[in-house]
Amino acid sequence: MSSIPAELKYTKEHEWIAATANPEIFRIGITDFAQGALGDIVYIQLPKIGESVTAEKVCGEVESTKSVSEIYAPLTGKIVAVNSGLDKTPEVINSDPYGSGWIAEIEISGGLADAPGLLSAPDYEQLTA
């Protein structure tokens, strides 16, 4: 069974969203369920800092020994940070998807109330059951 932290928000595409100290910046990554389905991750194409992203549109990709999967932006905004350590050690996503395996940070305006289709932990758990 995969881990689903209660304090995060989720998408149907298996991304997670975490609040940061700045109320307009959110950290994103792929869920434990997603990394488990992908298998051993060998490469990640990160979004670029300064790039504008649109919710539910592709912003990167993850390559594993099984397949290539697109990463969808869970929020509309601008990329303000990426986890460049994943360039050399993408497998960290497998071992710590909610911690050191984070992918990017997105600056948004309007807060999460304006974000479409975000799921609570119980709703995401139902989706993956």
Residue map of PLM features:
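Short beta-strand segments of a lipoyl-like beta-sandwich/carrier module
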Residues: 40-48, 53-54, 69-84
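Short, charged beta-turn/beta-strand-edge "cap" motif at the junction between a beta-strand
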Residues: 59-60, 65-66, 85-86, 110
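Short glycine-rich, polar/acidic loop-and-turn segments at beta strand-coil junctions
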Residues: 32-34, 66, 75
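Acidic, low-complexity mobile loops and tails
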Residues: 1-58, 91, 95-129
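Short, Lys/Arg- and Gly-enriched loop/turn segments at beta-strand edges
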Residues: 63-72, 89-92
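Nucleotide phosphate-binding site architecture
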Residues: 60, 80, 87, 125
